[in-house]
Amino acid sequence: MRNRRSIIWYHPDLKDQAKELRNNCTYSEKILWEKLKGKQMMGYDFHRQKPINYYIIDFFCHELMLAIEIDGSAHNSEKAKEKDRRRQEIFEEFGIRFLRFSEEEIRNNLDHVIEVIREWADEFENTGEMM
């Protein structure tokens, strides 16, 4: 596993794309970001549309090595699910763990989503390990 303080490389061409995604985020991304930004989540610093390697993660906390992905309808096909699985495996090789939520979960049950993230962070704090 990589040191949590290590720098995670990203392809420089992704910087502009990530900025564009931040400027044109979905409603689900907006409402989750309102709960994560400014270290509101237990003092952890989350970033949105974070370039890592050759990909962009919806939300990322370096200290927790936690990626949060919001899956919209484009992720429902078997081909998309396989692509997401392979992508997640690549990130897990860097020691990054994932939480995935659907857009519907974010829109319809945001409190539960926040609780899942808090529980994940609590477990990390208590054990020093990622789930």
Model feature map: region roles:
Residues 21, 48-124:
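Basic, amphipathic alpha-helical patches used to engage nucleic acids or provide basic targeting signals
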